[in-house]
């Protein structure tokens, strides 16, 4: 059973981004979205750590954030926060996709 450190790091990045948005701009929607999506990503990382084939919560959270923040980045061209989160989400999608393509390992 391998721990999904990348998934936990991604969850921490998303949640801390929401907190930073609240502290800097007083944005309650940023705080709520950051904590909800960070929590979902953290839960997905926990599930992936328990069963490497169970990637669906992580896939949904990172895919949704990649789409939403990618659209925001396309419209605003601002690296932070939209570009950073969109990029991290695309990297998580690539990691999850690569994990799906690997053969299962016998333990």
From Swiss-Prot:
Gene3D superfamilies xref list: Transmembrane protein 14-like (1.10.10.1740)
Taxonomic superkingdom: Eukaryota
Keywords: Heme biosynthesis, Membrane, Transmembrane, Transmembrane helix
Membrane-spanning ranges: 3-23, 25-45, 52-69, 81-101
Family matches, as Pfam families: Tmemb_14
Location(s) in or outside the cell: Membrane
GO biological process per UniProt: heme biosynthetic process; regulation of heme biosynthetic process
Role: Required for normal heme biosynthesis.
Family label: Belongs to the TMEM14 family.
Name this protein carries in UniProt: Transmembrane protein 14C
Lineage: Eukaryota, Metazoa, Chordata, Craniata, Vertebrata
Gene name linked to the record: tmem14c
């Amino acid at each position: 059973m391998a721990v999904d450190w990348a998934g936990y790091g991604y969850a921490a990045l998303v949640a801390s981004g929401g907190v930073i948005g609240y502290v800097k701009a007083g944005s309650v929607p940023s705080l709520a979205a950051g904590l909800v999506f960070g929590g979902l990503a953290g839960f997905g990382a926990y599930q992936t750590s328990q069963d490497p084939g169970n990637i669906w919560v992580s896939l949904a959270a990172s895919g949704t954030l990649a789409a939403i923040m990618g659209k925001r980045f396309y419209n605003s061209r601002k690296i932070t926060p939209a570009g950073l989160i969109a990029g991290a989400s695309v990297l998580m999608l690539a990691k999850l996709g690569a994990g799906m393509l690997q053969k299962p390992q016998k333990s």
